[in-house]
């Protein structure tokens, strides 16, 4: 039986896929403005994409913004993510700082989840995951391929590896070159969900071509999807309001 992931009042892996909406402001003013706009919205999780923040290399300033951000969103679960340039992010930082940043933020008690990239390496992952779990912070271990869609077996292998490394939520996002690539991602998702996963997983095929994968998680086995507030943080994201309507429609039809 698959275990569910409880984050505040949200149960990931139960019912329809949960909606996560990123905050991508470059400065404190913009970040707080986005937070105010989202605090009463129909969403499940807010992601702070801290790699967009102009002063991300100053941990003190990151914490100050985080404290204010939390005060506005109240009890909405918060995911903290620094996305590396290699995987589609905005800034380049050292692995040492990446590790320190995630540990320092996990220690604040202000975030509910953090995202750690699979290809940061086992040493970084072990250190961050173990620390976060001691602080009762859930961990997404993720991989983003902006160039291609790997073979089905490779997608499943990466998700299994994330699970082995202690991810509460394994996540993979891939780029389709054609319609068949979208089917490969969906087939890999379903195989992982039905055969190998003992916890919720998150998958998506990016770009407009892959948008169907962001909508049909309840059918194929992806437990969380990302929607945009105004600006997108990844190719293929659609408005979280439209996403909410479609997910509700599918959930009603399925059940």
UniProtKB/Swiss-Prot annotation:
Pfam families for this protein: DHquinase_I
Molecular-function GO terms, alphabetical: 3-dehydroquinate dehydratase activity
GO biological process, one term: amino acid biosynthetic process
InterPro entries: 3-dehydroquinate_DH_AS (IPR018508), Aldolase_TIM (IPR013785), DHquinase_I (IPR001381), Type-I_3-dehydroquinase (IPR050146)
Signal peptide: none
Disulfide feature: none
Matches recorded under PROSITE patterns: DEHYDROQUINASE_I
EC number: 4.2.1.10
Residue positions binding 3-dehydroquinate: 47-49, 83, 214, 233, 237
Annotated CDD domains: DHQase_I (cd00502)
Highest taxon above the source species: Bacteria
Gene3D superfamilies the UniProt entry points to: Aldolase class I
Annotated keywords: Amino-acid biosynthesis, Aromatic amino acid biosynthesis, Lyase, Schiff base
Reactions the enzyme catalyzes: 3-dehydroquinate = 3-dehydroshikimate + H2O
Active site: 144 (proton donor/acceptor), 171 (schiff-base intermediate with substrate)
Pathway connected to this protein: Metabolic intermediate biosynthesis; chorismate biosynthesis; chorismate from D-erythrose 4-phosphate and phosphoenolpyruvate: step 3/7
Task of the protein: Involved in the third step of the chorismate pathway, which leads to the biosynthesis of aromatic amino acids. Catalyzes the cis-dehydration of 3-dehydroquinate (DHQ) and introduces the first double bond of the aromatic ring to yield 3-dehydroshikimate.
Similarity comment text for this entry: Belongs to the type-I 3-dehydroquinase family.
Database matches in HAMAP family: AroD
Subunit structure, as described in the record: Homodimer or homotetramer.
UniProt-recorded name of the protein: 3-dehydroquinate dehydratase
Organism of origin: Clostridioides difficile (strain 630)
């Amino acid at each position: 039986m698959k275990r569910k992931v409880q984050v505040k009042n949200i149960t990931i892996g139960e019912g329809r896929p949960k909606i996560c909406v990123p905050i991508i402001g470059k400065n404190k003013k913009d970040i707080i403005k986005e937070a105010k706009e989202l605090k009463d919205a129909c969403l499940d999780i807010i992601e702070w994409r801290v790699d967009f923040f102009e002063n991300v290399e100053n941990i003190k300033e990151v914490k100050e913004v985080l404290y204010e951000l939390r005060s506005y969103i109240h009890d909405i679960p918060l995911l903290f993510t620094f996305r590396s340039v290699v995987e589609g992010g905005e800034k380049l930082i050292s692995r040492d700082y990446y590790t320190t940043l995630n540990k320092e933020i996990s220690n604040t008690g202000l975030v509910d989840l953090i995202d750690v990239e699979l290809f940061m390496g086992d040493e970084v992952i072990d250190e961050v995951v173990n620390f976060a779990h001691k602080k009762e912070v859930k961990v997404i271990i993720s991989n983003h391929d902006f160039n291609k869609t790997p073979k089905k077996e490779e997608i499943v292998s990466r998700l299994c590896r994330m699970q082995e490394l202690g991810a509460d939520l394994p996540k993979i996002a891939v780029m389709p070159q054609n319609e068949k690539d979208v089917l490969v991602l969906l087939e890999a998702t379903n195989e992982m969900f039905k055969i190998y996963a003992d916890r919720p997983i998150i998958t998506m095929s990016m770009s407009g071509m892959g948008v169907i994968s962001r909508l049909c998680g309840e059918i194929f086995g992806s437990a969380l999807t990302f929607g945009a507030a105004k600006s997108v943080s990844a190719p293929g994201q659609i408005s979280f309001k439209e996403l909410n309507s479609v997910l509700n429609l599918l959930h009603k039809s399925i059940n």
